[in-house]
Amino acid sequence: MKHSKKLLLCISFLLITVFISGCGSMTKEDNKEEKIKKGFEKTLGMYPIKNLEDLYDKEGYRDEEFDEGDKGTWILYSEMVIQRKGDDLVTRGMILKVNRNTRTSKGNYIINKISTDSKGVSRNTQKKFPVKMENNKIIPIKKIEDSKIKREIDEFKFFAQYANFNSLKDYKNGDIATNPKVPSYSAEYDLENSDYNVKQLRKRYDIPTQQAPKLLLKGTGDLKGSSIGSKDIEFTFIEKPKKNIYFSDSLDYKPSEGH
């Protein structure tokens, strides 16, 4: 009888130990997830930026990489990648550098096409169309003959202009990955088509699938802030061999070039 009681006590102790260890691991993962979300909130909390010219008066995270007197440059980048099954992979996106020193904004509308021939050899074709921003409107710097591309530039909006991440704190049970040696970090979430930002993307792009996407928050550098690191977000609808649909976006604050 005494042996049975001792055995029960040992088993109970082991179960409690395992439970506490499990809770400890969950707490660590929860802390990592919260830190990643807080790191992204500093930028995503600015969305939507309906008037991009507001960035001229908005300062980001500064570190020793900035020269004295440099007000910094905001760099926006948004792109949609669509590859229907068996077709070429086509990327359409824009980069815009908002220089707070000169209060000017220039960039490029970029169309990238990756095709693969019958021998499996890939070929990359890229077209760049210089653009600038005036009165919160993106306009071509050079004359564009192609009416389709001209219309795409005229109608283009950066994700930062219409996205809203007020519900970021409600995203739970993300797939968390960290590498302190790089350092790098990421959090991935399964979204529903009812998600506000997913609906906004479907409204603006012809997305040839009803499959709901995954949201990936990924970055490098110090989570608290770093002009060397980066923070990117991706909405992946489909990721398969010869069939890909995903959207990428970033908003970074960097030292100005040539300052």
Curated annotation (Swiss-Prot):
Lipid attachment, kind N-palmitoyl cysteine: 23
Where is it localised?
A: Cell membrane
Q: How does it sit in the membrane?
A: Lipid-anchor
> Could you tell me the keywords of this UniProt record?
Cell membrane, Lipoprotein, Membrane, Palmitate, Signal
User: Pfam families attached here?
Assistant: DUF576
At which residues is a lipid of type S-diacylglycerol cysteine covalently attached?
A: 23
Q: Which GO terms describe its cellular component?
A: plasma membrane
Could you say which residues form the signal peptide? Answer: 1-22
Q: Which InterPro entries match?
A: Csa (IPR007595), Csa_sf (IPR038641)
Entry's family note: Belongs to the staphylococcal tandem lipoprotein family.
Name-wise, this protein is Uncharacterized lipoprotein SERP2453
